[in-house]
Amino acid sequence: MTEIWNFINTGSKNPYYNMAMDEALLNFVSRGEIDPVIRFYTWNPATLSIGYFQRLQKEIDIDKVKEKGYGLVRRQTGGRGVLHDKELTYSVIVPESHPNMPSTVTEAYKIISQGLLEGFKNLGFETYFAIPRSKEERDKLKQPRSSVCFDAPSWYELVVEGRKIAGSAQTRQKGVILQHGSILQDIDIDDLFDMFKFKNERLKAKMKENFVQKAVAINDISNQHITLNEMENAFEAGFKKGLNIDFKPLELTEKQLEEVQELEDKYRSEAWMYRK
C-alpha cells in the first residue's frame, strides 16, 4: 500500500522564512504533529546560503553580497555556499525511525535522492548517483578545496554528463532527518564566485574553471528552455515514484505558523549569522 506524505509548495519567500519553515517542519514531525513532508520553495531575493559550520567573515565577501542585492543566510545543515537564484529548492523531512530510512547519512541520501533521479528522468535527463570510488576522491570530500558548493559531487548526489546537477545537505535533529537541496535551472557563475574570498585572482580563476567542469544547470544541457513550473511538476511526480508515496496537501495551523515566525527571527539575527 502506498504511504501518504504531506506536500507543501511555499513559493517564493525571503531566506529567513525559508530556513525557518524547514526547521519548523522538522519540529512538527519530531513532535508527531504531522506526517513526513516534502516541501518545494524558491527565494526572494536571490540568496547566498552558507553551511552551518562555515566561517562567514573569513570565507564570504559580505560587502559584495550586499552590493549585488543578494540575501545572505546561514543554514542549519552543513555543506558549503550555494547561490539560490534560478532553481527549485526542495526539502524532505522524515523521522529517523521511518522503516525506509537507513541509519547512515549516505544511505539515506541515496533513498531520498531516488525522488530527484526520477524527477530528472521526467525532464528527459539520464542522471546517475555520484559514488567516490578512490581514496583520493573520498579524501577530497573531507577537505574541499573551495567554499563553493557544486564544485564536486558528494556521495549519491546527482550527476549528468559527468557534472553535478543537484546539491543537497542533510542534518539529523530531534529524531528527524532534514535533507534539503538545490535543483539548478540556470546559474550565474561569475556572480557566485564574486561573493567568495580567495587568496588571489589566479586561484579564483582556477576554482571557477574547475567549477564549470564539475557543475551544470538544467538549461545548460536541455534542448529547450525548462520552466520552473515544469520542474515542479517533474519533481513532484519524481518523489512520488522514487519514494513510492502519494501526497496530501499540508495546511499549517495558526499556532504552527507562529512558530515559523519566531524561528524566522532567529535566522534573521546577527547572533545566528555570525555564529562562526
Curated annotation (Swiss-Prot):
Which reactions fall under this protein's catalytic activity? Answer: octanoyl-[ACP] + L-lysyl-[protein] = N(6)-octanoyl-L-lysyl-[protein] + holo-[ACP] + H(+)
Provide this UniProt record's keywords sorted from A to Z.
Answer: Acyltransferase, Transferase
One GO molecular-function annotation for this sequence? Answer: lipoyl(octanoyl) transferase activity
Q: Which SUPFAM superfamilies match?
A: Class II aaRS and biotin synthetases (SSF55681)
- Could you tell me which residue ranges the BPL/LPL catalytic domain spans? 32-247
Pathway this chain belongs to: Protein modification; protein lipoylation via endogenous pathway; protein N(6)-(lipoyl)lysine from octanoyl-[acyl-carrier-protein]
Any one Gene Ontology BP term: protein modification process
**Which residues does the entry assign to the active site, renumbered to this chain?**
149
Q: What is its EC number?
A: 2.3.1.181
Entry annotated with the keyword S-adenosyl-L-methionine: no
User: Which InterPro entries does the entry link to?
Assistant: aa-tRNA-synth_II/BPL/LPL (IPR045864), BPL_LPL_catalytic (IPR004143), LipM (IPR024898), Octanoyltrans_LipM/LipL (IPR050664)
Which residues are marked as site: Lowers pKa of active site Cys?
164
Summary of subunit composition and partner proteins: Monomer.
List, alphabetically, the HAMAP family matched. LipM
**Which family, according to UniProt?**
Belongs to the octanoyltransferase LipM family.
Instruction: Supply any other comment.
Output: In the reaction, the free carboxyl group of octanoic acid is attached via an amide linkage to the epsilon-amino group of a specific lysine residue of lipoyl domains of lipoate-dependent enzymes. The reaction proceeds via an octanoyl-thioester enzyme intermediate.
Q: What does this protein do?
A: Catalyzes the transfer of endogenously produced octanoic acid from octanoyl-acyl-carrier-protein onto the lipoyl domain of GcvH, an intermediate carrier during protein lipoylation.
Q: What is this protein called?
A: Octanoyltransferase LipM
Q: What is the lineage of its organism?
A: Bacteria, Bacillati, Bacillota, Bacilli, Bacillales
The gene behind this protein is: lipM
